[in-house]
Amino acid sequence: MCIRDSYGVETSYVPLDDPSAWEAAIRPNTKMLFLETPSNPLTTVGDLRALSALARARGIPLVVDNCFCTPALQRPLELGADIVVHSATKYLDGQGRVLGGAVLGSRKYVAESLQPVVRYCGPTLSAFNAWVLAKGLETLSVRMARHSENALAVARWLEARPEVERVRYPWLESHPQHALARAQQRAGGAVLAFDLKGADAAACKAAAWRVVDGCRLLSITANLGDVKSTITHPASTTHGRMPAEARREVGIGEGMLRVAVGLEDPQDICADLARGLAG
């Protein structure tokens, strides 16, 4: 956000799941539509077909952050997106070994927009990091299938817990955009979020941190994309710099926890969460 502001970039924020709000927010100086789907940490799903149609009608590129799904589970370019970005540090590598990213688009976009930049900044990772990332890609489809299978099992388990108010995971039938997720993703991915019950914000926050502190298998970190399961409190970490009122408006409450479900046995993951929920 600070880097964006230093370049004088203006940003309009809109509800991800409301295409009409996107259309209303477009101004004469709008240069692109940018989204992450599913979103972090709410797992809201953006309608890529509808938004790509809107972008084409307005002559604006649609840029999609596909970090959560990776190409194994979702292919935005095939759904009409113009540009796709990935954090290769996350699931593309999958084992927390390298830092990297990827920008994908048409040959025309690469030639006209990317090539002038990479000519001076460099277009590649170091040879070793590139090799490690290439080895990680060899297992991408297998890993993402297991991540998704485990995450769905954990999400269903959490839905049955009396301490939990709501579970947010696109592959659950209770997710408000379950049908849309099914239409554009191959599986639900690794990341879910859940909201704990509590009398007020302070009670919810205390309950959330009791869960975090009680876990032993899950790593306590804002990072994700590893084979290991991780847990974090978004209101204190990833979204801690947002004003509290802004967090409440978008639905990131003090009782929300985000879990990036790893490749461990799902029974072990649930047992660790049960330990945390027990306080």
Can you say where each PLM-predicted feature lies in the sequence?
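Conserved PLP-enzyme active-site core in the AAT-like
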Residues: 4-162, 168
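Short, solvent-exposed beta-strand edge segments and adjacent coil->beta transition regions
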Residues: 98-100, 187-191, 254-258
